[in-house]
Amino acid sequence: MRGVNKVTLIGNLGKDPDILYLEGNIPVSKFPLATTETYKDKNGKLISQTEWHNIVLWRGLAELAQKYLHKSSLVYIEGRLKTRYWEDRDHIRKVATEIVADNLIMLDKRSDQHAEEGHEPLPGSENPFEDSDKPSE
């Protein structure tokens, strides 16, 4: 039987994406993504619990992230878990589990505020139903 390695997240970037170009000019981008779950404890108090995920994007998705995403951007990510092992300079074994994204959807609503902050508007981010001819009530 085949296994399934599928991750789906909606969350906010913890910092601007980093991008670097590997041999062959292949772009790779990384950023932390925060997801927050809220629940009530036994006393009815709302508790928020945030998990941090390391996201890795390759090629076109990496360039898209570099161009349009910034700290606090809300995104939908689909991908798979990937664990890397290596030794640092002191020969200490390190482990990192990351989410290699196959799909990225930008969920932030387009606003002029982004343009003022130096961020370009997202292509295709217009809502085709916004300000449409609504039937009068």
Which ranges hold each PLM region?
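Acidic, gly/ser/pro-rich intrinsically disordered tails
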Residues: M1-G3, Y21-G24, G44-K45, I92, ...
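A generic structural motif
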Residues: P17, E37, L61, I105-D108
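Well-ordered beta-strand positions enriched in small/hydrophobic/aromatic, beta-favoring residues
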Residues: F31-L33, I55, I99
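Beta-rich strand-turn-strand
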Residues: I55-K94
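Core FKBP-type peptidyl-prolyl cis-trans isomerase
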Residues: V7-Q49, Y85, V95
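OB-fold/S1-family single-stranded nucleic acid-binding modules
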Residues: D88-M106
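A short, charge-rich alpha-helical start-of-domain segment used by transcription regulators
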Residues: E51-H53
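OB-fold and OB-like beta-barrel modules that bind single-stranded nucleic acids
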Residues: I10-L13, L33, K71-K82, A101-L104
